Regions:
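Intrinsic low-complexity, disordered N-terminal segments enriched in polar/charged/small residues
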Residues: 271-272
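Residues forming the flavin
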Residues: 1-217, 261-267, 276-277, 281-294
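Long, low-complexity segments enriched in small/aliphatic residues
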Residues: 200-261
Length: 295
């Protein structure tokens, strides 16, 4: 993206960190097909986030929590906020007597249409989550990712057969239902920069009354990290210790991911300035990476 300036004249991209667990619960607590979404708690009203709970087959429940990385308090631990979420009586009552069988986490691209980069470059096309086709209000992106992949495949065939330029991919995308869906959802995420209450009110007006067709588009004014405040200006957060029944620590959670890698695998994160973590992020922000990292 940087090399080919694919983000030129686009809003800064927005990100979130998402957590997901699969539970096998008691039959009397299971309602196959039930879908639940929540917003807010345990986060404060200035922090963007919400949950999903899907009752699947075989007495399984998929539950997760997504937190926007534009939060202000560097002491916040997204993983621990997710664990705390499960202690709410409405959620705990579903999980009690059950067993956690899987855990996972991943970064999400939340910027939507305003931050969508140019989707073509010499010899390559951007599709799915690499481009940022997630529908953030619905926390769904598999369907849009697959459709963008199908459009990319059509473009490649046209390019090889008829020597049509790869730029036709973006034209196809803008004529598809994916673009229409992302356009309708474009104002939801940026509206929550005003806080939870105003964000919900605006989203209700935008999505329910106007069906995402308001005659203006809200902007993402800056990158996520710009909102982070110095550690000394924000209150520390005291998270309860895990009970290993409903809530768990990171170590036992990572064990359930099933991931593996070679011991000598090269480190994929490269520091431009090795002094920066100590002299800047640790000193000013109490090194938030030790908390936002999900493993």
């Amino acid at each position: 993206i940087k090399k080919f300036e694919l983000d030129k004249d686009k809003d800064p991209q927005q990100y979130g960190i998402g957590f997901k667990e699969i539970w096998e619960i008691k039959e009397e607590n299971h309602q196959e097909g039930l879908v639940m979404h929540t917003a807010g708690w345990p986060l404060d009203t200035k922090t963007y986030g919400g949950s999903f709970i899907y009752h699947a087959e075989n007495k399984q429940v998929f539950l997760g929590y997504v937190i926007g990385l534009d939060y202000q308090n560097p002491h916040l631990s997204p993983f621990d906020e997710f664990q705390k979420f499960k202690t709410h009586s409405a959620i705990k009552s579903i999980l009690e007597g059950g067993k956690r069988i899987s855990y996972g986490a991943r970064a999400l691209i939340e910027g939507g249409l305003q931050s969508l980069p140019r989707m073509y470059m010499p010899g390559a096309l951007l599709i799915g989550c690499d481009a940022g086709t997630l529908n953030m209000p619905k926390i769904k992106g598999s369907h849009t990712a697959m459709k963008s992949g199908m459009l990319a495949a059509e473009t490649i065939v046209d390019h090889l057969k008829e020597k049509i330029e790869l730029s036709i991919y973006e034209d196809k995308f803008k004529k598809s239902w994916v673009y229409k869906e992302l356009y309708a959802a474009r104002n939801v995420k940026p509206s929550f920069s005003w806080g939870l209450i105003l964000g919900i009110i605006f989203t209700g007006i935008d999505q329910i009354l106007f069906r995402g067709k308001l005659p203006f588009t809200l902007k993402h004014k800056h990158a996520d990290h710009k909102t982070l405040k110095p550690a000394k200006e924000m209150p520390k957060i005291d998270y309860p210790k895990p009970d290993n029944i409903i809530t768990f620590d990171k170590t036992s959670s990572v064990y359930l991911t099933g991931t593996n890698h070679a011991d000598n695998q090269p480190v994929h994160l490269k520091l431009k300035d090795k002094d920066l973590p100590i002299n800047y992020t640790l000193e000013k922000f109490d090194e938030p990476a030790q908390r936002y990292c999900p493993v």
